[in-house]
């Protein structure tokens, strides 16, 4: 993302980011800025050919993926894998671990590079390899100062949201560090047009490998912890809708409607 944008472009980016993993209020604030965000694509099996992965899969050859564009018609066409849409088995099956000795290989490094580009182009704050049709345990995430600057201060405080640099994790293993939880609305690049409230742990620790193959450990809290849980869920074949609070699922257009009677309130639980 460029550092210099006119107001319309900045508002568009805010609208898209807010609908990925931000609470309702930010999404409602920017609803008036609308741009097309999807167009038909091809099967995730085409993505797998980019990385010399086996194309035999339980996925239907007719399964279509959704390609999310970050800036509408202003985006130039680039040669990147498509984001796979919900319903494709690659999103609902457990991903395979990467051999640590292969992390530095050209194939794995290309997968990581493409994941970063796709995440930023969307734009989103996280992406898992299965979302580009690659059934491997790799995630990428980042939350920039620019993204956070668009959110209201009270929202940032409620989320315990702090910026962090690009993070790449291979074979991540996540564990909660406390029983404290919070409830906020989530979205997903693979489930376009819908949102639901999901309860997540506020503090987690994640171990794994970085893109150089070195062992790393990340202690995360607040919004970063939520993003990590969301992306690690993808590696086990789970989407946020598999963990959503019942009766909170809704379209983006209905984000401003009140929660159904009996639903828990948003925020720390």
From Swiss-Prot:
One of its GO terms (biological process) is co-translational protein modification. Signal peptide: none annotated. Zn(2+) binds at residues 188, 230, 234. It is found in: Plastid, Chloroplast stroma; Mitochondrion. GO terms for molecular function: metal ion binding; peptide deformylase activity. Residues 1-60 form a transit peptide. Keywords: Chloroplast, Hydrolase, Metal-binding, Mitochondrion, Plastid, Protein biosynthesis, Transit peptide, Zinc. It catalyses: N-terminal N-formyl-L-methionyl-[peptide] + H2O = N-terminal L-methionyl-[peptide] + formate. The active site is at 231. GO terms for cellular component: chloroplast; chloroplast stroma; mitochondrion; plant-type cell wall. Expressed in roots, leaves, flowers and siliques. It comes from the Eukaryota. Substrate binds at residues 123-126, 187. Its main location: plastid. Binds 1 Zn(2+) ion per subunit. Its EC number is 3.5.1.88. Its cofactor is Zn(2+). Removes the formyl group from the N-terminal Met of newly synthesized proteins. Homodimer. Belongs to the polypeptide deformylase family. This is Peptide deformylase 1A, chloroplastic/mitochondrial. The lineage of its organism: Eukaryota, Viridiplantae, Streptophyta, Embryophyta, Tracheophyta.
């Amino acid at each position: 993302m460029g550092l210099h944008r006119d107001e319309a472009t900045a508002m568009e980016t805010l609208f898209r980011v807010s609908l990925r993993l931000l609470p309702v209020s930010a999404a409602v604030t920017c609803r008036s800025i609308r741009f097309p965000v999807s167009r038909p694509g091809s099967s995730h099996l085409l993505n797998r050919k980019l990385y010399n992965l086996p194309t035999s899969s339980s996925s239907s050859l007719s399964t279509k993926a959704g390609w999310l564009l970050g800036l509408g018609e202003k985006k130039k066409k680039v040669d990147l894998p498509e984001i796979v849409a919900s319903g494709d088995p690659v999103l609902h099956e457990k991903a395979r671990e990467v051999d640590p000795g292969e992390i530095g290989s050209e194939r794995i490094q290309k997968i990581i590079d493409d994941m970063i580009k796709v995440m930023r182009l969307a734009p989103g704050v996280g992406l898992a390899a299965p979302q580009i049709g690659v059934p491997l345990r790799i995630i990428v995430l980042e939350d920039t100062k620019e993204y956070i600057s668009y959110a209201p201060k009270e929202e940032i405080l409620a989320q315990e949201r702090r910026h962090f640099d690009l993070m790449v994790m291979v074979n991540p293993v996540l564990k909660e560090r406390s029983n404290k939880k919070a409830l906020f609305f989530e979205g997903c690049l693979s489930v376009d047009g819908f949102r639901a409230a999901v309860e997540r742990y506020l503090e987690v620790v994640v171990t794994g490998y970085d893109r150089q193959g070195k062992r790393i450990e990340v202690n995360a809290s607040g919004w970063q912890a939520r993003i990590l849980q969301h992306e690690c869920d993808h590696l086990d074949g789970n989407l946020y809708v598999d963990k959503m609070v019942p009766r909170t699922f809704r379209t983006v257009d209905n984000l401003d409607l009140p929660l159904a009677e009996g639903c828990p309130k948003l925020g720390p639980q």
